[in-house]
C-alpha cells in the first residue's frame, strides 16, 4: 500500500509542478483531492505517456528486426551458395568422421552446383547420350558410376577457413598435404611428383620410367594416369609441360583423326582410369585433336572442337593453374593459347586438390616436366612457376664425369698412368733382351724420387766392427762327392762333414785357410793314432761291433 501511495505522490507532484529546484514535495495522502476533474486529467497524462513509450519501443524493435533480417539473409544466402540448399545450418561443426563418405558426396554435389555443366542436366544428358554408340554409352555410365562410388576428396572451405582462424593446436591436419608430404617435397623438389598407375588397370597398359616418362601400350581403348601428389596451391601460379616424345604413327591423319586421341589435363581424384580426362566431373583437358573438354563426354560444338591447334609427335603442351582465381590456361610449344572465342579461360575452378593427368587410347610415350629442368614457355622460367625447386634440399649424387677433380680418384689416376707409362716404356727394352735394375731411381710425374724397394740387406742390421765380405752362394760351393758311410772311412766322413759345414756360407779365402789348417790337424791326429795303445783300438772295435749288432 505504501508503494502505491509513493507512486501516486510522484505522479501528482510531477504533473502539478510541485517538484521545484531539484527537490520533490511529497503531498500527504490525506491532502490529495480525488475530484472528478483531477482524476480525468491524471488518466489522460498517463495514457499519453504510455502511448509514447509504446511508440518508442516499437520503433526500436523494428530497427533491430530490420538489421537482423538483413544480416541473416546475407549469411543464409552465402551459405547456400557455398554448400547448397540441401545442407543443414548449424552453429556447431557437423562434420562426422563416421559419415565421411556421405560428407564427400555432398561436397561433390555442391561443387557441381557451383560449376554447372552438361552432365548435370538429366534431360540434356538423355538426348546427347542417345547420339553415342552403345560402347560409348556403356563406358560413360561406368565412369559416372565410378565417380559416385568413389567421390573425390574435397575439404569444406568454410571449415578450412575456420581452422586457420582458430587455435593452431586444435586445427585439423590436412590428410593429403600434411607435414610429412611437405617435408618430402622440400627434400625432393620437383622430383617428388611421379605418375602412378591405378592398381585395377590391366597389366602392361601403362609403363612409368624415371617417375615422369609415361608409355601407353593400349590400343583402341581409353586409359589415364595421374600423379601421386596434387598441386600444392601455395604459390599463385603452377605450370607443367607434357612432351609427345613418341607416337605410333600420325595422330591426326584421315584414318586416325576421330579415334587416336591423347589428352592432357587436370582433375580431382579418384578419376576413372578407363576414361580420358575432361569427360567427367571436375576435369579439364586439351585433346591432341585440338578440342578443349571441360566436364563433357559428348559431341562438342564446332568452336570447342577446333579451339586449339592439333598436336603431333614432338609438340609440347603446357597447363597452367592460378590457385587464387581458379583459372586454367594452356600453351603449345611455348606460346600461350587464346580462348576468347569460347568466352576466355576457365575461371573460378577452385578445388583443394587438383592432379595432373594424362590419357590416351593409342600407343605413345609422354615426358612430363614439373620443374626439374627449364620450360619451353619462357614466362614460366622467369617467374619460376614450377611445382617446386628443381632439386630441393636433398644433396644430389656425385658426378663422375670430371673424376680428375676428386682427390682420391686423382691419386688413383696417377698410379694407373704411371703403370701404363712404365709398361709402354719398358716393353721395347724387355723385347730386346735388356734387364732393368730394380735399384734404379724411380721418378714420378711430379719429379719426386721414390725410395728403392726393400732388399735382404735391409732385413737385419749389418754387424758392426767386422768387414763385410760379398760372397756368392751357388752349387759350386757345395761338396762334389756324396758322403761315404763305410766303416773304414768313418773318420774321413766326420772330417769332410765338418769341412763341408765350414764351407757352406763362407768365402773362398776362408775355405782355403781352413782346409790347410785341417790338413795339418789330420796329420797330427794320424801320428797320434800310431802312437796310441793297441788296447784302445780293440776297445773301440768292440764298441763298433756292438753298435752294428744293435
UniProtKB/Swiss-Prot annotation:
PROSITE patterns: B302_SPRY (PS50188). The keyword Phosphoprotein applies. The keyword Protein transport applies. Pfam families: SPRY (PF00622). It is found in: Endosome membrane; Vacuole membrane. Glycans are attached at residues 110, 203, 210, 256, 295. Keywords: Endosome, Glycoprotein, Membrane, Phosphoprotein, Protein transport, Signal-anchor, Transmembrane, Transmembrane helix, Transport, Vacuole. Residues 172-375 form the B30.2/SPRY domain. The modification Phosphoserine is found at residues 519, 538. GO terms for cellular component: endoplasmic reticulum; endosome; endosome membrane; vacuolar membrane. The chain crosses the membrane at residues 46-66. InterPro entries: B30.2/SPRY (IPR001870), B30.2/SPRY_sf (IPR043136), ConA-like_dom_sf (IPR013320), SPRY_dom (IPR003877), SPRY_Ssh4-like (IPR035780), Ubq-SigPath_Reg (IPR050618). It is a single-pass type II membrane protein. Belongs to the SSH4 family. Components of the endosome-vacuole trafficking pathway that regulates nutrient transport. May be involved in processes which determine whether plasma membrane proteins are degraded or routed to the plasma membrane. This is Protein EAR1. The lineage of its organism: Eukaryota, Fungi, Dikarya, Ascomycota, Saccharomycotina.
Amino acid at each position: 500500500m505504501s508503494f502505491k501511495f509513493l507512486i501516486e505522490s510522484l505522479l501528482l507532484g510531477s504533473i502539478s509542478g510541485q517538484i521545484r529546484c531539484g527537490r520533490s514535495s511529497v503531498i500527504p495522502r490525506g491532502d490529495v483531492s480525488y475530484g472528478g476533474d483531477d482524476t480525468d486529467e491524471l488518466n489522460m497524462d498517463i495514457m499519453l505517456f504510455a502511448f509514447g513509450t509504446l511508440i518508442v519501443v516499437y520503433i526500436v524493435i523494428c530497427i533491430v528486426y530490420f538489421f537482423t533480417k538483413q544480416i541473416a539473409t546475407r549469411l543464409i544466402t552465402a551459405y547456400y551458395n557455398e554448400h547448397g540448399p540441401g545442407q543443414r545450418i548449424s552453429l556447431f561443426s557437423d562434420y562426422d568422421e563416421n559419415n565421411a563418405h556421405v560428407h564427400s558426396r555432398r561436397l561433390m554435389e555442391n561443387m557441381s552446383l557451383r560449376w554447372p555443366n552438361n552432365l548435370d542436366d538429366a534431360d540434356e544428358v538423355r538426348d546427347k547420350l542417345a547420339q553415342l554408340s552403345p560402347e560409348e554409352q556403356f563406358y560413360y555410365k561406368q565412369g559416372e558410376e565410378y565417380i559416385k562410388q568413389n567421390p573425390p576428396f574435397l575439404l569444406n572451405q568454410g571449415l578450412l577457413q575456420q581452422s586457420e582462424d582458430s587455435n593452431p593446436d586444435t586445427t585439423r591436419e590436412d590428410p593429403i598435404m600434411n607435414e610429412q608430404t611437405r617435408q618430402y617435397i622440400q627434400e625432393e623438389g620437383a622430383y617428388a611428383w611421379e605418375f602412378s598407375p591405378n592398381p585395377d588397370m590391366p597389366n602392361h597398359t601403362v609403363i612409368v620410367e624415371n617417375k615422369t616418362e609415361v608409355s601407353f601400350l593400349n590400343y583402341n581403348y581409353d586409359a589415364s594416369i595421374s600423379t601421386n601428389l596434387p598441386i600444392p596451391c601455395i604459390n599463385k601460379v603452377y605450370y607443367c609441360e607434357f612432351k609427345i616424345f613418341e607416337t605410333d604413327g600420325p595422330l591426326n591423319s584421315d584414318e586416325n583423326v576421330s579415334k587416336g586421341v591423347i589428352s592432357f589435363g587436370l582433375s580431382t581424384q579418384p578419376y576413372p582410369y578407363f576414361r580420358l580426362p575432361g569427360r567427367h566431373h571436375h576435369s579439364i583437358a586439351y585433346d591432341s585433336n585440338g578440342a578443349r573438354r571441360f566436364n563433357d563426354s559428348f559431341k562438342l560444338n564446332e568452336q570447342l572442337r577446333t579451339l586449339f591447334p592439333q598436336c603431333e609427335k614432338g609438340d609440347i603442351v603446357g597447363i597452367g593453374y592460378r590457385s587464387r582465381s581458379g583459372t586454367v590456361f594452356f600453351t603449345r610449344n611455348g606460346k600461350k593459347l587464346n580462348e576468347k572465342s569460347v568466352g576466355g579461360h576457365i575461371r573460378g575452378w577452385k578445388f583443394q586438390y587438383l592432379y595432373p593427368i594424362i590419357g590416351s587410347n593409342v600407343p605413345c610415350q609422354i615426358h612430363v616436366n614439373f620443374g626439374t629442368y627449364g620450360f619451353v614457355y619462357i614466362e614460366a622460367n622467369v617467374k619460376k612457376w614450377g611445382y617446386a625447386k628443381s632439386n630441393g634440399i636433398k644433396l644430389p649424387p656425385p658426378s663422375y664425369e670430371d673424376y680428375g677433380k676428386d682427390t682420391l680418384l686423382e691419386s688413383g689416376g696417377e698410379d694407373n698412368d704411371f703403370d701404363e707409362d712404365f709398361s709402354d716404356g719398358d716393353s721395347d727394352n724387355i723385347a730386346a733382351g735388356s734387364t732393368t735394375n730394380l735399384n734404379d731411381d724411380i721418378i714420378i710425374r711430379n719429379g719426386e724420387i721414390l725410395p728403392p724397394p726393400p732388399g735382404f740387406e735391409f732385413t737385419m742390421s749389418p754387424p758392426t766392427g767386422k768387414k763385410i765380405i760379398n760372397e756368392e752362394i751357388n752349387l759350386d760351393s757345395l761338396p762334389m762327392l756324396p758322403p761315404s758311410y763305410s766303416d773304414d772311412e768313418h773318420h774321413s766322413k766326420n772330417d769332410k762333414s765338418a769341412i763341408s759345414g765350414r764351407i757352406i756360407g763362407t768365402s773362398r779365402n776362408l775355405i782355403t785357410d781352413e782346409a790347410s789348417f785341417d790338413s795339418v790337424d789330420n796329420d797330427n791326429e794320424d801320428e797320434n793314432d800310431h802312437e796310441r795303445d793297441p788296447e784302445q783300438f780293440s776297445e773301440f772295435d768292440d764298441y763298433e761291433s756292438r753298435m752294428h749288432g744293435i
